[in-house]
């Protein structure tokens, strides 16, 4: 397999340097980490479902998930401090590139009626976040093992603080953005 990291180092960096007119190669934007997170919502009280959500994310990411806990009690949401409210995984280096390649090549094309991911997920600091409605698009997830169907948020953190540069980086890496109408 050619590998997305090798593709980034051999082709994407040179295209970025030309298009963004950056002379110093150390200033070129790069992908630093990918965070996959799931909020349990109404299922936060059931620890078996929380364990199942964490296990599903671990299968998808290839790395153990961490169960996130509430920092404060919120009476309106019936949440107590320290209560499990979701799960997350932070991917870096080799696992990050493997996950991104699997997402682009295998998982996103399996989304029903897929026309590209939104361009509106940039936060103004060069990071991009988008949501997936269902975890079944990933080949590692077996339908019979799922207790609750849930979506997830995927955040891509880049080294740049500019949305334009981050968009160019992700576009050259092969992320299928929706066409502008």
UniProtKB/Swiss-Prot annotation:
This is one of the proteins that bind and probably mediate the attachment of the 5S RNA into the large ribosomal subunit, where it forms part of the central protuberance. In the 70S ribosome it contacts protein S13 of the 30S subunit (bridge B1b), connecting the 2 subunits; this bridge is implicated in subunit movement. Contacts the P site tRNA; the 5S rRNA and some of its associated proteins might help stabilize positioning of ribosome-bound tRNAs. Keywords: Ribonucleoprotein, Ribosomal protein, RNA-binding, rRNA-binding, tRNA-binding. This is Large ribosomal subunit protein uL5. GO terms for molecular function: RNA binding; rRNA binding; structural constituent of ribosome; tRNA binding. Gene3D superfamilies: 3.30.1440.10. Part of the 50S ribosomal subunit; part of the 5S rRNA/L5/L18/L25 subcomplex. Contacts the 5S rRNA and the P site tRNA. Forms a bridge to the 30S subunit in the 70S ribosome. It comes from Helicobacter pylori (strain ATCC 700392 / 26695) (Campylobacter pylori). The gene is rplE. PROSITE patterns: RIBOSOMAL_L5. PANTHER family: 60S RIBOSOMAL PROTEIN L11-RELATED. InterPro entries: Ribosomal_uL5 (IPR002132), Ribosomal_uL5_bac-type (IPR020930), Ribosomal_uL5_C (IPR031309), Ribosomal_uL5_CS (IPR020929), Ribosomal_uL5_dom_sf (IPR022803), Ribosomal_uL5_N (IPR031310). One of its GO terms (biological process) is translation.
């Amino acid at each position: 397999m050619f590998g997305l990291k090798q593709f980034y180092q051999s082709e994407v960096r040179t295209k970025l340097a030309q298009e963004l007119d950056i002379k110093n190669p150390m200033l070129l934007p790069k992908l630093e980490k990918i965070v996959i997170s799931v909020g349990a919502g109404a299922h936060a009280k059931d620890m078996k479902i929380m364990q199942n959500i964490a296990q599903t994310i671990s299968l998808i990411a290839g790395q153990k998930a961490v169960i996130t806990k509430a920092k404060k009690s919120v009476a309106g949401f019936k949440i107590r401090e320290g209560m499990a409210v979701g799960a997350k995984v932070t991917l870096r280096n080799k696992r990050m590139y493997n996950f991104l390649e699997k997402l682009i090549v295998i998982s996103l094309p399996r989304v029903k009626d897929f026309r590209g991911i939104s361009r509106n997920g940039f936060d103004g600091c060069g990071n991009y976040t988008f949501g997936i409605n269902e975890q079944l698009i990933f080949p590692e997830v077996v339908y019979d093992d799922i207790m609750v169907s849930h979506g997830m948020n995927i955040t891509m953190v880049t080294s740049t603080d500019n949305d334009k540069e981050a968009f160019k980086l992700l576009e050259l890496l092969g992320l299928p953005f929706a066409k502008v109408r």
